[in-house]
Amino acid sequence: KEERCRILEEMGVDILLECPLTEKIRHMKAENFIKEILIGDLQVSYVAVGEDFRFGYERKGTPAMLKEFGKKYGFHTEVLPKEMDGRRKISSTFVREELNRGNMEKFRFLMGTDFSVEGIVEHGRGMGHKYLLPTTNLIPPVEKLMPPNGVYITVSHFRDRSYQGITNVGHKPTVGGEKFIGVETY
C-alpha cells in the first residue's frame, strides 16, 4: 500500500483518497455510489475512467452511466481508451504475465517504470560481509507479486543515494538451508 502511494505521488497525484471496501460499499448499487460517494461526499467535478471500467454491485456501473449522471448533476466524465501494445490491450493481466515470465523490459514498457520492491533490511548471518561481499537482504511482503527466481541487475536506493548491484530473487545462495523466498542484493 505504501509503495503504491509513493508511486502515485511520483506520478503527480496530489491527494489520494481510498474508499475502504466495507460491506455497505460492496453491496452498493452503482447509482447509489454515484449519488452518495461521488456527488454527496466528494462533490466531484471531473471523473476519468477507462473504457472497460465497471463499478457498483455486480459491476453494473459503466462509463456511459457516469456520463449520464454527470450531465444531470454537473460533473464531467472522460472515458480514456485502452492503451495498446501492438494488437493487445494493456491490462493488469498482461503486466502480471510479463512479470511472471521475467520479461522485465516488457514490464518496464507496459508500466512506464521499473519493477521495484521495498522493505526493511533483514539481518542475515553476516556471511557475505565475512567474505568481503556484503549483501542486503529483504523479505518481500507476502502480497507482492515477484518476478521468477533468478539474478537481476538492479539499483538500490538508500538515504538519497543509488547503488548498482546484482540481486538474487529466490532462495538465498549465501545461506544454506533457507526455505523462504527472499531478495538478496550484492
Question: What residue ranges belong to the model's regions?
Answer:
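Classical nucleotidyltransferase
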Residues: 24-134, 149, 157
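Active-site rim/loop-helix segments in enzyme catalytic domains that contact anionic ligands
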Residues: 1-15
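Short secondary-structure boundary segments
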Residues: 20, 51, 169-171
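Phosphate/ribose-recognition catalytic cores of enzymes acting on nucleotide-derived substrates
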Residues: 124-186
